[in-house]
UniProtKB/Swiss-Prot annotation:
MF (Gene Ontology): 3'-tRNA processing endoribonuclease activity; ribonuclease P activity; tRNA binding
Disulfide-linked positions: none
GO cellular component: ribonuclease P complex
The protein's name in its UniProt record: Ribonuclease P protein component
Gene designation per UniProt: rnpA
Amino acid sequence: MKNFDKFSTNEEFSSVYKVGKKWHCEGVIIFYLNSYEKKIAVVASKKVGKAVVRNRSKRILRALFAKFERYLQDGKYIFIAKNEITELSFSRLEKNLKWGLKKLECFK
């Protein structure tokens, strides 16, 4: 995630939620808004679990994003962890995330 910045305001989240594309995958929901900026946010609500579980889920999603980062178009990305993320293996999550990003046409 060297090239991507974090979201800084609620307005950025709102704009991506309202205008951006959305795709549900197993374990994660992906929001994407094509933009000249490169920004990312990883979210895990309390439905996912306690703090340790939420933080682990976010770390996993950031690691997967770092794997695909160089192949992705510029834009704003939001990854929302679902509660079933804890039951999936890393390789299964990687496959699901790659499939979802392809469906949103995020790859260069």
